[in-house]
C-alpha cells in the first residue's frame, strides 16, 4: 500500500539530547514511572477530527491544507483512503489509541439509511485496521452539532423529529464503539444550550437532555457495553450558554436526573479556560466529585474567547494535573486524547507529527514531575496538616452528624474558643512546586 508519510518510518525515543524533530526526547513508552510503564500511565490517543477532517478553513478563509482524501470523489472511497492515512499516522506516531466522531470516519449520506449503511461499512474497515495495527479505540461519539438540522440543538431541539434523528446517530455510534472494543463513549453537547432566552424554555430543554442521557444509560446496559460513559463540559461556543458548562454544573445536572453514578467526565483543558477555570481546577473538581474519567489534552489561549485547540506545552500546569490524576489512582478506561490541531499556516504534512511529538513529550515530562511530587510527599503532608483538626474529636463529631448547630455553638461557648488564623503559606508551596519542576 502506498504510504502518505513516506519520509518517516516510526517516531522513536532518542533521549533528551536528540536534535531530531521527528523523535521523542522525553516520552519513552517502556520507561517505568512509579513501577508502571509510561505508556500505560498516559494512554495517549490521537483524534480523527482535527487531524484528518479539518481542512484548514476558518471564519475568514477557505481551507489551506492539501489533503488527498479531502478531494472530490466517491465519499466512501475517500473515507477509506482517510482511514489508510489515519492508521499509518497512528502507527508511526506510536500512540496506542485513537478517537472519532461518527461522521469523521464515515460519510453522513443524504438519509438515515445511507448514514447507517456507510457507517456499518466503515466499522468493518476500522476493525480490520485495528487488528492489523494493534491501535485501539479509546472512545467514540456522535457528531450531533455540525449538520444544519442541529442549529437549535440535538437533544434540546424544539422539534422531537430532530431529537429522534440525533438519537439514531447516538445509538448507531454507541453500537459501533462497542463493536470496535472502545473503552469509553463520549457525549459532547455542541449545541445543547441557547443563544437567547427569548425563544428558550429552559425547563423543557433540560428535561429533553436529561431524557436522552437516561436513554443512553439504558442502551449501554442493554448491549452490555462495559466501557465508561463520559460527558465533556464546555461553557459556550457555538451557543452562548451550554448546559454542560463545567464539571460542577454537570454534576448538578446528573444529580437532577439520577445519573451521577452512571456517567463521568471527559475534561478538556481549553474548555476549562473558556469557563474561567484552570485545567488543574477542572481535573481536581471532577476527582473530588467522583466523576473523573478521561482527558482531552490541549491548551487554549487566555487572551482569546474561543476554542483554539492548541497542543499542550505547559509543563507547569500539566504536571499539577498529572499529580491529581496520580493521587486519584490514575486512568482506568480513560486516557490523554490530543484534541488539538496544527495551526492554519502549518501546511507541511509532517507538522501533524511535530505537534503531537511535542505534546507527548510535554505530558511525559509532566508525568515525571508529578511522580517526584508523589514520591517526596511533602505537598500532600502540608495539605494534611492544614486540615488535621478535622480528624480530631470536634471535627469528627461535626462531620458525622453527632452535633447540631446549637450543640456546636454551645461547645464554642463552653470551651471559650478563640481560634487564630494560620498562614496558608501559598508562596512557600509555590516555591516547593517550582523545586519539583526545575531542580534536577
Curated annotation (Swiss-Prot):
Record field: catalytic activity: alpha-D-xylose = alpha-D-xylulofuranose
GO CC annotation terms, alphabetical: cytoplasm
Disulphide bond pairs: none
Superkingdom: Bacteria
GO molecular function: magnesium ion binding; xylose isomerase activity
Catalytic residues, chain numbering: 101, 104
Entry EC no(s): 5.3.1.5
Protein location: Cytoplasm
Membrane-crossing segments per the record: none
Amino acids binding Mg(2+) 2: 268, 271, 307, 309
Cofactor: Mg(2+)
Family indicated by similarity: Belongs to the xylose isomerase family.
Protein known as: Xylose isomerase
Gene this chain is encoded by: xylA
